[in-house]
């Protein structure tokens, strides 16, 4: 029997230290709900998890971006509806003025209303704003006559670079629709049946222009609706994948924690027994 080195006690102490460390890790995981709390727990798993988290947060923001885009489109469409109603009324008055039974004085009264309605078209265009940005004055329109863009509304609908799309909204002022002269800014004149007749054709083109823009906005909105649904599914699936990597299985971890607690208790008891074994040497010295 030797007394300088108690191998049983040394083994028990080393094993007990390892088990205590395991218990500490069990407690960390159970309290945080995470299998990976630091890089030392799983270096590669942490790297993959953080990359996934970046994508998940990007997708969640992209979904919000797309929903904001839908709101932008809905606001623009609402203003265009008002413009349509005004143009329809001007056309109705033009059809009325084109009838020969009205006198010059009658047409003058009609012209007064037409002038006010044309001014309303410009008011709508100048007041149609989203987050302080004018929507119907050409800010987001294609440049006339060329296949280039003066500006556009970009919607970033992905988690990564260049995953975006843009929408165009044409100029919807009275000048752009031909019901106000671009030079002297005079209003469409319907003081004779001939002028009123020509005005009907101009107004038909204006209505066609608005209808085309509203159809484009409807297509943009439908696309963004599908985009939001797709992004949400992608984010959900990626979140599930990230959870499998990073989150702890609580039931399994609790079983492991219970096992390690028992080992700590038994290890402590055995360390005491190992230390006590050397005390028997004293009986030889008596």
Swiss-Prot record:
Signal peptide: none annotated. It is found in: Periplasmic flagellum; Periplasm. GO terms for cellular component: periplasmic flagellum. InterPro entries: Flagellin, Flagellin_C, Flagellin_C_sub2, Flagellin_N. Keywords: Bacterial flagellum, Periplasm. It comes from the Bacteria. One of its GO terms (molecular function) is structural molecule activity. It holds the Pfam family Flagellin_C. Belongs to the bacterial flagellin family. Component of the core of the flagella. The flagellum consists of an outer layer composed of repeating units of FlaA around a core that contains several antigenically related polypeptides. Interacts with FliW; a synthetic peptide of FlaB1 (residues 229-247) partially blocks binding of this protein to FliW. This is Flagellin FlaB2.
């Amino acid at each position: 029997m030797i007394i300088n080195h108690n191998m049983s006690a040394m083994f028990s102490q080393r094993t007990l230290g390892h088990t205590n460390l395991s218990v500490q890790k069990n407690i960390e995981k159970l309290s945080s709900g995470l299998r990976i709390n630091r890089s030392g727990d799983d270096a590669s798993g942490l790297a993959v998890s953080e990359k996934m988290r970046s994508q998940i947060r990007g997708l969640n923001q992209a979904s919000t971006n797309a929903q904001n885009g839908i709101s932008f489109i809905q606001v623009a469409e609402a203003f265009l509806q008002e413009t349509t109603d005004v143009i329809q009324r001007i056309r109705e008055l033009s059809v009325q003025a084109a009838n020969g039974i009205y006198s010059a004085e009658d047409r003058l009264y009609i012209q007064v209303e037409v002038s006010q309605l044309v001014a309303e078209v410009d008011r709508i265009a100048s007041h149609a704003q989203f987050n302080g940005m004018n929507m119907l004055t050409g800010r987001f329109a294609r440049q006339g006559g060329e296949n280039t863009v003066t500006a556009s509304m970009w919607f970033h609908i992905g988690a990564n670079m260049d995953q975006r799309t843009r929408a165009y909204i044409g100029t919807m002022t009275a000048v752009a629709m031909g019901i106000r002269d671009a030079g002297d800014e005079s209003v469409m004149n319907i003081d004779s049946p001939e002028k009123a007749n020509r005005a009907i054709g101009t107004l038909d083109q204006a209505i066609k222009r608005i209808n085309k823009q509203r159809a484009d906005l409807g297509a943009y909105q439908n696309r963004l609706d599908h985009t939001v649904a797709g992004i949400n599914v992608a984010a959900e699936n990626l979140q599930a994948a990230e959870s499998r990597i990073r989150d702890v299985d609580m039931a399994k971890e609790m079983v492991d924690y219970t096992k390690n607690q028992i080992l700590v208790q038994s290890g402590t008891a055995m360390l005491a027994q190992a230390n006590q074994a050397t005390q028997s040497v004293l009986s030889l010295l008596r």
